[in-house]
Amino acid sequence: MLHLIYISIIVVLIIILISYTHKPKYFRITAPRSVTLFHGIHPLNPKNYKTFSEEFETILNNAIEDGDFKGQLTEPCSYALRGGKYIRPIILMEIVRACQLQHSFGAPIYPAEAALAVEYFHVASLIIDDMPSFDNDVKRRNKDTVWARFGVAKAQMSALALTMQGFQNICRQIDWIKEHCPRFPDPNQLGALLCTFVSHSLNSAGSGQLVDTPEKTIPFFKIAFIMGWVLGTGTIEDIGVIERAAHCFGNAFQLADDIKDHDTDTGGNYAKIHGKRKTFDVVAQSLQECKKILQGKKIYTSIWNEIFQKVINVALGT
């Protein structure tokens, strides 16, 4: 099934890249939405985590209502997406917001489509992770896993649908920018770059999933950080620095989870190997390095204190 997903990603990616490189700057490659995902939401207003989470839930509900998922896959995809913490889309939206306080493109960017994409990719990976051929989990987020509720076949196809829809969301984000942000530099080129980067990150996540390493966690944070940076600044300048911040945060997130699962994990749990105390020290060091990078790029805002504390709370079991 993973091979089918990867082949489908490659085919879609080729089509997207051809579209971006052979069409005029203002050519749409996606159909317009029938609803406004972000009605009543202003992207430049400062927000706390709770407000961001509620706003993203509104965006998600609107996207599902607008038909992001079709037919028999609507219910399992919607089911899988409910009840998350939405930390990845919140990170993406906040980075875009912070960047726009320094960069103007003629109109504020609403990164709703990109935020949906990163959550879709992440949830697709969770569905696969829970499958009988991987972790064989029957519970997640205090409810049945997708395969346990809907069956293996629908779970597999739901993961594929989420992944494919995520790429369409990225394309829709670029189309929206082309229509609403006249000073955004070369959106077609950045759209092709983002799709290529995301494809590479998903491949890394898939490889990490097979051997159960932090590389199944970190790539999704790289997608959130880097898409946020590129959409917020309109450039790939310093993208390596932002990727480093994402790596530090993703590493802290995974190790905090290892501490939480110390007593139940049977695989290569870092905290089991090195001890909880040392692992917690690495979590704190990684978060501190991430903070330093974000401060250096002037995108460390008050909500990061909440985000970092959530990671610490996982490690502390609170």
Swiss-Prot record:
Its EC number is 2.5.1.-, 2.5.1.1, 2.5.1.29, 2.5.1.10. The keyword rRNA processing does not apply. Its cofactor is Mg(2+). Keywords: Host endoplasmic reticulum, Host membrane, Isoprene biosynthesis, Late protein, Magnesium, Membrane, Metal-binding, Transferase, Transmembrane, Transmembrane helix. Pathway: Isoprenoid biosynthesis; farnesyl diphosphate biosynthesis; farnesyl diphosphate from geranyl diphosphate and isopentenyl diphosphate: step 1/1; Isoprenoid biosynthesis; geranyl diphosphate biosynthesis; geranyl diphosphate from dimethylallyl diphosphate and isopentenyl diphosphate: step 1/1; Isoprenoid biosynthesis; geranylgeranyl diphosphate biosynthesis; geranylgeranyl diphosphate from farnesyl diphosphate and isopentenyl diphosphate: step 1/1. Mg(2+) 1 binds at D129, D135. This is Trans-prenyltransferase. It comes from African swine fever virus (isolate Tick/Malawi/Lil 20-1/1983).
